[in-house]
Structures are given as structure tokens and as C-alpha cells.
């Protein structure tokens, strides 16, 4: 196994030698490895073949962090999969189409760059004044699934982090009337591809610090002009306020997503309330009591 302080891939060329950055890098790698192991993302195939992942790269801080940490794990022998980086150029006005191909080629990262003008479709279909995000995301997802199949990949790997998952939970809670979020691992509707989110335990702030320290060529995410007033931005502001008033609240809330008690919720599809009887094992602490936040 390679020494943990060794720069093992061109993606880490010029990495800061500061103690602070080394701690940051080690923390991101540890959390990513934990998520991969905890949620069983690496397939153990009976025929001994190596799984192949399509790593989706948008040019934002999160996807650069994802790509770098996956390559670090792979080069350390801790991630026995083949990686193919993929960028889908959706025809957004002003998108710098040469940035990612040049970066990936310079880094020696196998990649597929594909142009699909979904932007024009979205502009044509979405009424004026509405945000493009939902339809744009659906079209992007369909194209990524197609590319994964064409490339023989068993999984599409996305750069969503802890804060994305928390925000999605509260969006579902506030606007969808359900307790749900982005899972770290799922199977697509067709049943032929996994979708993985290895950065599920990594904080957005860490991704931002990492990508900035590495000086990756960040592409802005607001090229379509459809970002203002989004529900996600509103939820982010709420969470920012909670975190400011009570530092550490984000992590507490995130831990709650891994500590669900169906018997202490209200969904009869998740727990057999009808069959609950005196003397049953499902008893104990009253989770209806609100704990004092310290």
C-alpha cells in the first residue's frame, strides 16, 4: 500500500503541504471510504470481473473532490473498480466546453465528454418565470444512464455531499409532505444501474476548501440563469441560520437520518402498529420527548 502522505496521482499535483490541508484531505478520504463500505457500493462479482463506475463531473467543487478522492482510494488499492469520468455538456450559454476535456487529459483520467443540447429543450418546455432545474435534471439523468450503459458501467456516481442530502430531506419535509432524501445507494427505475453518492458523509465546506486549495478549474453552476429563488436556496439559508445559532446542528440532523425509529413515527407501512401488544420487544425510551439541545 502506498504511503498516505505521498502524492499518488496528477490530480494531487501541487497539493498544499500544510498540516491543515493534510488533515482535510485525510478526513474527506476517510469519510468517503466509510460511506463506500457502509452502504456496500463495491460489487463482489461471482465471476471476479471488475466493476466500472461512471463518475459524473460537472466542473463544480463537489465533483472535482469526488473524482480526486476516488482516484486516491483506487491508487491505494482500497477501491477495486475501474473509473470513467464523464461530463455532459448540456448546451448552456457560456459553458466553457474545453475546460474539462483539457483538465482530464492533462491529469491522465479516462473520460467521455458528450454534447447534448438539453438546454434548448428545457427553455422551450418550461413556462417563463419557472425554474429549469427539475426538467434539466431529468434530461441529464436520462443521458447519463444511457452513457453508462454504452460504456459498460454498472453504476453512475454523483458528487452530492452531506449538505445536499440534508437540504433534500427538508425540501421533501416542507414541500413534499414526506420523510425522504437522496440515499447514498439506490437502483434506477429500470433496475439495471446503481446510483452512488460516496461523498454522503462529507460536508460541503470541506469540498469547497479542498477544491479551492487544489486550484481546480471551477465552472460556475449558474450559467442558465435559473438559480435565484429556488426552494433549495431557501432551505440552505434556514440550515445556515440554525448552524450559526447552534454550531454542529447540521451534523446532529445528519446523524438523525441514520437513526430512524419507525415505531416512533406515524407510518403504518413501516411499522405494524396493529400487531403491537403489551409485553412486545418494541418498547423503551420515549422518543416523543424532545431532548434539550446543548
UniProtKB/Swiss-Prot annotation:
Q: Per the UniProt record, which EC number(s) apply here?
A: 2.8.1.-
Q: Which GO terms describe its cellular component?
A: cytoplasm
Pathway(s): tRNA modification
Question: What's its top-level EC category?
Answer: transferase
**Where along this sequence does the record place binding of [4Fe-4S] cluster?**
133, 136, 224
Report the coiled-coil segments: none
Which Gene Ontology MF annotations are present? 4 iron, 4 sulfur cluster binding; ATP binding; magnesium ion binding; sulfurtransferase activity; tRNA binding
Keyword Cytoplasm recorded: yes
The membrane spanning regions, by residue number, are: none
Cofactor entry: Mg(2+); [4Fe-4S] cluster
Q: Which reaction does it catalyse?
A: cytidine(32) in tRNA + S-sulfanyl-L-cysteinyl-[cysteine desulfurase] + AH2 + ATP = 2-thiocytidine(32) in tRNA + L-cysteinyl-[cysteine desulfurase] + A + AMP + diphosphate + H(+)
One of its GO biological process terms is:
tRNA thio-modification
Which key words are in the record?
4Fe-4S, ATP-binding, Cytoplasm, Iron, Iron-sulfur, Magnesium, Metal-binding, Nucleotide-binding, RNA-binding, Transferase, tRNA processing, tRNA-binding
| Short sequence motif named PP-loop motif, residue ranges | 58-63
What the protein does comes down to:
Catalyzes the ATP-dependent 2-thiolation of cytidine in position 32 of tRNA, to form 2-thiocytidine (s(2)C32). The sulfur atoms are provided by the cysteine/cysteine desulfurase (IscS) system.
Per its UniProt record, what HAMAP family does this chain match?
TtcA
Please give the family membership noted in the entry: Belongs to the TtcA family.
- Further comment: The thiolation reaction likely consists of two steps: a first activation step by ATP to form an adenylated intermediate of the target base of tRNA, and a second nucleophilic substitution step of the sulfur (S) atom supplied by the hydrosulfide attached to the Fe-S cluster.
Summary of subunit composition and partner proteins: Homodimer.
Q: What is this protein called?
A: tRNA-cytidine(32) 2-sulfurtransferase
Q: Which organism is it from?
A: Ruegeria pomeroyi (strain ATCC 700808 / DSM 15171 / DSS-3) (Silicibacter pomeroyi)
Q: What gene does this protein come from?
A: ttcA
Amino acid at each position: 500500500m502506498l504511503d498516505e502522505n505521498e502524492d499518488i496521482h496528477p490530480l494531487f499535483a501541487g497539493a498544499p503541504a500544510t498540516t491543515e490541508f493534510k488533515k482535510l484531505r485525510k478526513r474527506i478520504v476517510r469519510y468517503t471510504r466509510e460511506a463506500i463500505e457502509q452502504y456496500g457500493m463495491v460489487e463482489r462479482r461471482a465471476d471476479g470481473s471488475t466493476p466500472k463506475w461512471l463518475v459524473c463531473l460537472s466542473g463544480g467543487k463537489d465533483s472535482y473532490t469526488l473524482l480526486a478522492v476516488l482516484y486516491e482510494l483506487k491508487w491505494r488499492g482500497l477501491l477495486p473498480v475501474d473509473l470513467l469520468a464523464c461530463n455532459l455538456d448540456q448546451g448552456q450559454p457560456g459553458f466553457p466546453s474545453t475546460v474539462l476535456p483539457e483538465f482530464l487529459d492533462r491529469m491522465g483520467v479516462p473520460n467521455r465528454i458528450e454534447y447534448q443540447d438539453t438546454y434548448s429543450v428545457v427553455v422551450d418546455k418550461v413556462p417563463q418565470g419557472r425554474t429549469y432545474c427539475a426538467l434539466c435534471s431529468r434530461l441529464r439523468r436520462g443521458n447519463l444512464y444511457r452513457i453508462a450503459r454504452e460504456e459498460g458501467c454498472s453504476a453512475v456516481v454523483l458528487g452530492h455531499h452531506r449538505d445536499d442530502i440534508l437540504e433534500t430531506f427538508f425540501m421533501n419535509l416542507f414541500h413534499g409532505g414526506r420523510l425522504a432524501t437522496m440515499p447514498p445507494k439506490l437502483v434506477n427505475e429500470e433496475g439495471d444501474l446503481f446510483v452512488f453518492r460516496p461523498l454522503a458523509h462529507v460536508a460541503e465546506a470541506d469540498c469547497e476548501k479542498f477544491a479551492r486549495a487544489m486550484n481546480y478549474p471551477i465552472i460556475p453552476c449558474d450559467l442558465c440563469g435559473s438559480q435565484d429563488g429556488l426552494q433549495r436556496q431557501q432551505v440552505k439559508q434556514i440550515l445556515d441560520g440554525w448552524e450559526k445559532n447552534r454550531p454542529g446542528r447540521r451534523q446532529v440532523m445528519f446523524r438523525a437520518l441514520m437513526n430512524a425509529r419507525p415505531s416512533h413515527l406515524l407510518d403504518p407501512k413501516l411499522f405494524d402498529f396493529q400487531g403491537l401488544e403489551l409485553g412486545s420487544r418494541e418498547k423503551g425510551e420515549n422518543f416523543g420527548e424532545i431532548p434539550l439541545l446543548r
